[in-house]
C-alpha cells in the first residue's frame, strides 16, 4: 500500500483578510506580511513546492477530494451555524466566530478542506492506504 497525500490548490485561496496577527488593520495597527495572520497559504504552498522539487509528491498517492457534503458537515456543526457561514460567505465574507475571518467563497473552501480530511481518514479506514496526510486550509480550529 501507500501513503496518501490529499491537497487541493483551492484551499490555498482561503483569504482571512488583512490583519496584524489577531488585530484588524487600521488606525495605529500596521499590516504585516502575508496578511498578518499566523495561518497563511504561504507556509502550505512552500511545503507543497518543496515536496514537488524533491520528488516526494511523486512517491505518494497524491490526490484531491470532493468537498464535504452538507450532511457530513452537520455531523459536527448545527444547521444554523452552516446557514450563517454560507450566508456571510455569499455576501462577501466576514467573521463567523472569534478570530475566524474569511472572504467570499470561504464556505466552499472550508467544505473542500473538510472533504480532504474526511477522504484521507476514509481511505486509511477502508484499507486503501497505510496512512495519509491532508494539507488543507482553513484548518477549522475556530469552528463551533
Segments and roles (model prediction):
Residues 1-144:
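HDAC/HDAC-like amidohydrolase catalytic core signature
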